Curated annotation (Swiss-Prot):
Keyword hit for Transmembrane helix: yes
Bilayer topology annotation: Multi-pass membrane protein
Pfam families named in the record: ThrE_2
Protein's name in the database: Probable succinate transporter subunit YjjB
Subunit structure: The transporter is composed of YjjB and YjjP.
Function: Involved in succinate export with YjjP. Both proteins are required for export.
S-S bonds: none
Organism this protein belongs to: Salmonella typhi
Length: 157
């Protein structure tokens, strides 16, 4: 893949991830003045995740680093725009939730329930369940760590 193709794919990924970020921000009743910032933050987070995954990182670490970026920028923007950081960050990380892994794990569990135990189906269930759980954990830890770092009252040393 050439650099132009990669940049076009990255831009497409960022634009397509900004749409659900704005949609969920509207569902969460985010003020209208914050909607473009939610879209931008969702695009930046998802773009960083895609960039890291194309560089060879796995999806869990890429998601963790992207949610760290989203949390850090959200805290800074909350200071500038006098809003709570969750206004920007929660809707921005929703496009990174592991829908396909969770769905595949759920379908595998239903198949095991109806058809009986089979080792390949159990491997599929456990693999996708652990992947989805790891991604959700990376999102939650990545969003909370910048707040712990930046709002710390004591010196770090």
């Amino acid at each position: 893949m050439g650099i132009i193709d990669f940049l076009l794919a990255l831009m497409q990924d960022m634009i397509l991830s900004a749409i659900p970020a704005v949609g969920f921000a509207m569902v969460f009743n985010v003020p209208h003045r914050a909607l473009p910032w939610c879209a931008l933050l969702g695009a930046l987070g998802h773009g960083l995740r895609m960039l890291m995954m194309s560089a060879g990182f796995n999806i869990e670490w890429s998601t963790f680093m992207a949610s760290l970026l989203v949390g850090s920028i959200g805290i800074q923007w909350s200071r500038w725009y006098l809003a709570h950081p969750k206004v920007f960050t929660v809707a921005a990380v929703i496009p990174m939730f592991p829908g396909i892994s969770a769905y595949t794990a759920m379908i595998s569990a239903v198949k095991i329930s109806h058809l009986g135990y089979s080792e390949p189906m159990m491997i599929t269930l456990l693999t996708n369940f652990l992947k989805a759980s790891s991604i959700v954990g990376a999102l939650s830890i990545g969003l909370s760590v910048p707040g712990l770092w930046l709002y710390r009252k004591r010196p770090r040393v």
